[in-house]
């Protein structure tokens, strides 16, 4: 029967703190002079001053990391992970205790100059947010640490930078700026920059926090190759529990102390490495075929999902024309026109003429006539758009009976004088009919004189309005017309509605538009 190994085993349990439930290593267990240790921390404390009070971030951390190890640091927020990473990276100094990094002893008395040189020469950083210089290309970003170190010539720096970018799969992105790269590509440039000076330790602060599943697998494969092939020590802070199985040891932190240390079994780690390599091979095949893959589960690597970004292209023909709707409902329009009787005379209403009208309010109902060469487009119930071209064709298509409907309708230029006389005799209207002959000679309407002004096209969409003396309601007709156009149907208004004149609607629309 095959022996089953647990994924992790707890390394040492000493000096248990019942309140915090933490596990620490005694100082006697730390060999400060072990040459195999790339990092040794002994009773490290860090306290930040907040006013007159001190806030402890680290409280007696002791540990040793051997050269070439892969360490994962886990813990809740506020547990001291980032503070410990800053101290290891010489960005900050401990308040108390000693640390030995790459053979150099560091304490609270170490100068910033010594820390800066040690950081430049022996440590590489990979951050969650990449921290690339936006004004420099990928090649120039990788060259920057080598320029600061000053050990290579310009040609040697460029040659090494190209070699590093080729290693991380960015050979075709040398002259691209960070804004032109995806998140995974930026992280690969960050890794190339971090290893530019051949560091002994690579510090990783949430390196896959901003990446998707595919890029996470690619980055982890790249990091594990650096660890195994070039013997670079990796110390990674992460919240992704799926990444801990690639490491050698797992350090759990809580309240500024090491809670426990776990060691990952070789068999379990080997299985995860094999699965990672298979995933990366499949990713490479899909990328060659132009497909981006996402693994839904760990058991079936072939079960992938295509990803992509769709761009919507809109053309004028994609918009719905309400004119076509009116053509299909011409019977409804004719019925609404024929059923409108002499209600305006009974109510002592005012009639307003508009020679370019394509709809009329009759008997409290808004009806739309069939319009040729002029379309009203609407998309997703947004604001309607009107086309005021060829209004003369509209006028020629509108023939209403003025004697029966008491409306000032638009007839052909040959019948304009007769229609105006009928309107003046039957309706006693105070509209602009006295000058209709001259108006008709000048393309019949204000809207024809202002073909580029859409306000008059909207205002002329009603050829007569009933002005009732009962002021029981003060509703705006603009919203009603807007809804009517969007819905493409006739709106029903009650006879008690106080409708506005064309000039009033024009003024309202001027304020809105």
From Swiss-Prot:
GO terms for cellular component: ATP-binding cassette (ABC) transporter complex; plasma membrane. Residues 39-280 form the ABC transporter domain. Keywords: ATP-binding, Nucleotide-binding, Transport. The keyword Cytoplasm does not apply. Residues 361-386 have a biased composition (Polar residues). Residues 324-360, 387-471 have a biased composition (Low complexity). The keyword Transport applies. GO terms for molecular function: ATP binding; ATP hydrolysis activity; ATPase-coupled transmembrane transporter activity; transmembrane transporter activity. PROSITE patterns: ABC_TRANSPORTER_1 (PS00211), ABC_TRANSPORTER_2 (PS50893). One of its GO terms (biological process) is sorocarp morphogenesis. ATP binds at residues 75-82. Pfam families: ABC_tran. Residues 291-471 are annotated as: Disordered. Belongs to the ABC transporter superfamily. This is ABC transporter H family member 2. It comes from Dictyostelium discoideum. The lineage of its organism: Eukaryota, Amoebozoa, Evosea, Eumycetozoa, Dictyostelia.
């Amino acid at each position: 029967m095959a022996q089953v190994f647990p994924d992790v085993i707890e390394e040492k349990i000493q000096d248990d703190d019942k309140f915090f439930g933490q596990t620490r290593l005694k100082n006697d267990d730390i060999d400060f002079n072990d040459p195999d240790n790339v990092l040794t921390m002994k009773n490290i404390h860090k306290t930040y001053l907040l006013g007159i009070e001190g806030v402890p971030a680290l409280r007696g951390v002791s540990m040793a990391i051997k050269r070439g190890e892969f360490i994962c640091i886990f813990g809740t927020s506020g547990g001291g992970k980032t503070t410990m990473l800053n101290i290891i990276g010489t960005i900050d100094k401990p308040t108390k205790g000693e640390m030995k990094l790459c053979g150099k002893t560091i304490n609270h008395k170490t100068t910033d100059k010594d820390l800066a040189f040690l950081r430049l020469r022996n440590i590489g950083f990979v951050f969650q947010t990449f921290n690339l210089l936006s004004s420099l290309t990928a090649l120039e970003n990788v060259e920057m640490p080598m320029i600061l170190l000053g050990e290579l010539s310009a040609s040697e720096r460029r040659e090494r930078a190209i070699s590093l970018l080729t290693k991380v799969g960015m050979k075709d992105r040398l002259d691209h700026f960070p804004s032109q790269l995806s998140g995974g590509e930026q992280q690969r440039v960050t890794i190339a920059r971090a290893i530019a000076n051949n560091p002994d330790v690579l510090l990783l602060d949430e390196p896959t926090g901003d990446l998707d599943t595919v890029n996470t697998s690619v980055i982890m494969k790249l990091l594990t190759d650096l660890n195994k092939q070039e013997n670079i020590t990796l110390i990674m802070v992460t919240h992704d529990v799926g990444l801990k199985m690639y490491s050698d040891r797992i350090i759990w932190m809580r309240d500024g102390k090491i809670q426990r240390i776990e060691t990952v079994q070789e068999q379990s780690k080997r299985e995860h490495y094999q699965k990672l390599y298979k995933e990366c091979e499949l990713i490479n095949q899909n990328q060659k075929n132009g497909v981006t893959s996402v693994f839904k589960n760990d058991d079936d690597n072939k079960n992938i999902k295509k990803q992509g970004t769709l761009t919507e292209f809109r053309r004028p023909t994609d918009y719905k024309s309400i004119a076509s709707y009116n053509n299909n409902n011409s019977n409804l329009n004719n019925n609404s026109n024929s059923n409108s009787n002499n209600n305006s005379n009974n109510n002592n209403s005012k009639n307003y003429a508009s020679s370019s009208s394509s709809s009329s309010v009759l008997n409290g109902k808004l009806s739309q006539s069939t319009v040729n060469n002029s379309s009203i487009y609407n998309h997703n119930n947004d604001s309607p758009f009107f086309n005021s071209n060829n209004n003369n064709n509209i006028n020629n298509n509108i023939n209403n009976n003025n004697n029966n409907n008491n409306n000032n309708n638009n007839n052909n230029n040959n019948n304009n004088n007769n229609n105006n006389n009928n309107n003046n005799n039957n309706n006693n209207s105070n509209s602009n009919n006295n000058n209709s002959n001259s108006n008709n000679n000048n393309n019949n309407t204000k809207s024809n004189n202002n073909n580029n002004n859409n306000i008059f096209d909207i205002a002329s969409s009603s050829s007569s309005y009933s002005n009732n003396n009962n002021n029981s309601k003060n509703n705006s007709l603009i919203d009603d017309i807007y809804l009517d156009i969007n819905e493409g149907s006739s709106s029903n208004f009650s006879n008690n509605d106080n409708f506005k004149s064309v000039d009033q609607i024009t003024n309202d629309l001027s304020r809105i538009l």
